[in-house]
UniProtKB/Swiss-Prot annotation:
Record's function text: Regulates the trafficking and gating properties of AMPA-selective glutamate receptors (AMPARs). Promotes their targeting to the cell membrane and synapses and modulates their gating properties by slowing their rates of activation, deactivation and desensitization. Does not show subunit-specific AMPA receptor regulation and regulates all AMPAR subunits. Thought to stabilize the calcium channel in an inactivated (closed) state.
Modified residues (Phosphoserine): 253
GO biological process: eye blink reflex; membrane depolarization; membrane hyperpolarization; neuromuscular junction development; neurotransmitter receptor localization to postsynaptic specialization membrane; positive regulation of protein localization to basolateral plasma membrane; positive regulation of synaptic transmission, glutamatergic; postsynaptic neurotransmitter receptor diffusion trapping
Alphabetical UniProt keywords: Calcium, Calcium channel, Calcium transport, Disease variant, Glycoprotein, Intellectual disability, Ion channel, Ion transport, Membrane, Phosphoprotein, Synapse, Synaptosome, Transmembrane, Transmembrane helix, Transport, Voltage-gated channel
MF (Gene Ontology): channel regulator activity; ionotropic glutamate receptor binding; voltage-gated calcium channel activity
GO-annotated cellular components: AMPA glutamate receptor complex; cell surface; cerebellar mossy fiber; endocytic vesicle membrane; glutamatergic synapse; hippocampal mossy fiber to CA3 synapse; plasma membrane; postsynaptic density membrane
Taxonomic classification: Eukaryota, Metazoa, Chordata, Craniata, Vertebrata
Species assigned in the record: Homo sapiens
Residues modified to Phosphothreonine: 321
Spans traversing the lipid bilayer: 10-30, 104-124, 134-154, 182-202
Residue ranges of the region described as Disordered: 233-261
Record-listed Phosphotyrosine modification sites: 271
Signal peptide: none
Protein name: Voltage-dependent calcium channel gamma-2 subunit
């Protein structure tokens, strides 16, 4: 089995779709996108005062919350406040827009939904193999999911790098976690699966066109082998050839022969027919003279050579039969 075999392509597409969906779902649902140093705040109520204790520790964060990795608040998680009160940004700047998009996490969630739809299309293509547009829809879903994923990653990086609540030293002391790399890997796999699905659709379309052409050729060859079709075709070809050459058909008929019209006048002059027997007896041309038969036949044989063969039987009977 080669790499471009249909079974191998379908297996790779199915495995890739499951992997991309699983990786993106894990990335969205976990809190290990970013490792950085932050402040874990807590409030403790005593008898007469409320004290706030701020402690800067190592934290890990995701799309939804931040958790402490060390200190007295190890394992404590809190929701991410994307719009703190002490932040020095204006509401009409691009920073506010990035924070709004970052807070909604719309692009990662949209990527998960599109990956799920693409997986359903791939599963449906196995049950409805005659509907080739399903695999094309799967490819479109996966490509769109990859684009939505990479947009969400770019927005996350931009929002984290431009966080005004962090000092310059804190902005440089962070690293991305395995959830972030799961999302990036999901983007790569989703794009590969989308391209492979579109390639499968193109291959199937080419096979269908080749099969249709072969079927049309076989039907045409089968029709030409039918005897009635061949007979009609021969008649049409003959009629067309006759219509293009009318002069040859007229010349070939015996009526058009030049010597054929001269023969009756010659024979009638040999035997003069008369209704009066007396005139027939006195007229020298009405009697048949056997002495001059040989000389007359010699003159009569001077008929054109090209007409002698076709009229031989008729002239022989008329020469030997007296009237």
């Amino acid at each position: 089995m080669g790499l471009f075999d249909r079974g191998v392509q379908m297996l790779l597409t199915t495995v890739g779709a499951f992997a991309a969906f699983s990786l993106m779902t894990i990335a969205v649902g976990t809190d290990y996108w970013l490792y950085s140093r932050g402040v874990c705040k807590t409030k403790s109520v005593s008898e007469n005062e409320t004290s706030k204790k701020n402690e800067e520790v190592m934290t890990h964060s995701g799309l939804w919350r931040t958790c402490c990795l060390e200190g007295n608040f190890k394992g404590l998680c809190k929701q991410i406040d994307h719009f703190p009160e002490d932040a020095d940004y204006e509401a009409d700047t691009a920073e506010y827009f990035l924070r709004a998009v970052r807070a909604s996490s719309i692009f990662p969630i949209l990527s998960v939904i599109l990956l799920f739809m693409g997986g359903l299309c791939i599963a449906a293509s196995e049950f409805y193999k005659t509907r080739h547009n399903i695999i094309l829809s799967a490819g479109i879903f996966f490509v769109s999911a990859g684009l939505s994923n990479i947009i969400g990653i770019i927005v996350y990086i931009s929002a984290n790098a431009g966080d005004p609540s962090k000092s310059d030293s804190k902005k440089n002391s962070y690293s991305y976690g395995w959830s972030f790399y799961f999302g990036a890997l999901s983007f790569i796999i989703a794009e590969m699966v989308g391209v492979l699905a579109v390639h499968m659709f193109i291959d199937r379309h080419k096979q269908l066109r080749a099969t249709a052409r072969a079927t049309d050729y076989l039907q045409a060859s089968a029709i030409t082998r039918i005897p009635s079709y061949r007979y009609r075709y021969q008649r049409r070809s003959r009629s067309s050839s006759r219509s293009t050459e009318p002069s040859h058909s007229r010349d070939a008929s015996p009526v058009g022969i030049k010597g054929f019209n001269t023969l009756p006048s010659t024979e009638i002059s040999m035997y003069t027919l008369s209704r009066d027997p007396l005139k027939a007896a006195t007229t020298p041309t009405a009697t048949y003279n056997s002495d001059r038969d040989n000389s007359f036949l010699q003159v009569h044989n001077c008929i054109q050579k090209e007409n002698k063969d076709s009229l031989h039987s008729n002239t022989a009977n008329r020469r030997t039969t007296p009237v």
